[in-house]
Amino acid sequence: MVRNLSMILSLGFLFSNTPSNTRPVNTYSIVAYDDSTGQLGVAVQSHWFSVGSLVPWAKAGVGAVATQSLVKVEYGPDGLKGMDEGKLPHTILSELLADDNGRDLRQVAMIDRHGNVSAHTGEKCIDYAGHQIGKNYSVQANIMEKPTVWPAMAMAFEKTRGDLADRMMAALDAAENEGGDLRGKQSASMLIVSGKPTGIPWKDVVMDLRVDDHPTPLKELKRLIRIHRAYQHANKGDHYLELGKIDEAMIEYGRASQFYPENPELPYWSAVTLAGIGDLQKALPIFREVFDK
């Protein structure tokens, strides 16, 4: 109770003494680099509406940034611009902080395409607040229930096996399991970009998922990741179908249905494909199952 009251008073003081162009996105997040794929990503959860529209920034083949606490959004695009010019995250962050009168209220992390990392937690970020840098990642949090949140995130990211989405999701789950944001939970986001830019923006984004307002944002984010994987396989199936590789297409359509079994449209297109090549014996049972739902 005392800690909650202290937090409320602290927030009131900070909001009355900060510029109107900042937003109090107090939260926990991770920026990370996958050295096996080159992918770069940011994942975040907050008790603030649409955290994904403010905190995470990433550019294929360049880097990723998380800007939070009393958010100054410019750290995102300016950080990416600096990394695109070849500057190290530490240099960029130092320069940006030097020009920011509100630096003590900021929490920022940056990682580049080589895994170089830099992070900052301002002295006036509300407790519990801190960050931890490890190989190819940084985790950071403020207004947390416990000071164990970001160490738990680091351990989860390091120990989890899987792709970048799996590992960053594990970090978010670990934060919530330690108590998470003292104020509760509201929104979450995951942004992942490719390691090698194609010059085609929509191809360079591997994953861009947002839960803007939800009572259990991490649970919903995991559901969206699962659906995203389903449609990745469905898209691969369509690609194989265009190439006339029917067997490969059917394998991908099957995988899509496994990830998203509650959606009848995915097996429907499997049946359409089979019917299109004249294999009605296999197509009809799938059609029946789809239309019985």
Identify the residue ranges that each predicted region occupies.
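Conserved alpha-helical positions within TPR/SEL1-like repeat arrays
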Residues: 268-269
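Bacterial Sec-dependent signal peptides at the C-terminal "C-region" and cleavage site
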Residues: 3, 7-23
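Alpha/propeptide regions of enzymes that mature by internal proteolysis
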Residues: 17-183, 190, 212-245, 254, ...
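Register position in tetratricopeptide repeats
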Residues: 242, 276-277
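Structural marker of alpha-solenoid helical repeat scaffolds
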Residues: 259, 292-293
